[in-house]
Amino acid sequence: MQYSDYPQMALGHQRYIDYAVRHAHKVAIIDTDFITTQAFCIQYEGKAHPFLDSMIKEYPFDVTILLKNNTKWVDDGLRSLGSKKQRQQFQQLLKKLLDKYKVPYIEIESPSYLDRYNQVKSVVEKVLNDEELEGLQHTKRTLTNEK
């Protein structure tokens, strides 16, 4: 993959996001957002992509659930972030980008898959019931054109 491939990947994500939102019943769960794609771009290409920046601003998410990188690494052949140090650095990059774009997020820190499932389920139930989310790192965001 090359730097020039990231916009095409983002456009593919955009189509899936649009479809999911159109067919969702109140909640659409998106596995990979544009911030994650931007983080991989920075990690692998050494710089952010302006197209991804515009997609992050154009597609604000109500809340992001950030899972801490503290489970066993599974090498899927697509990513090369297997060391503990690399995973921690990538987690910090994700948080930095979430903060930069003022994306509301909740970080789930448990390494237990069952605990993660139950915590995510609780977040989704609160969203469905219009309840306040505890532990939200940002409130709703308002982006202005940054120059």
Identify the function of each model-found stretch:
Residues M1-G46:
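Conserved nucleotide-sensing/catalytic segment adjacent to the nucleotide-binding pocket
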Residues M1-S4, H25-V27, N129, G135-L143:
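Catalytic phosphate/metal-binding cores of nucleic-acid and nucleotide-processing enzymes, i.e., regions
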Residues A10, Y117-K121:
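Short, amphipathic alpha-helical "lid/cap" segments that border enzyme active or binding sites
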Residues Y16-A20, L97, V127:
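Hydrophobic helix-cap positions at the C-terminus of alpha-helices
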Residues Y44-D115, L128, G135-T139:
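A glycine- and Lys/Arg-enriched "phosphate-lid" helix/loop adjacent to the NTP-binding pocket
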Residues S122-D130:
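C-terminal alpha-helix
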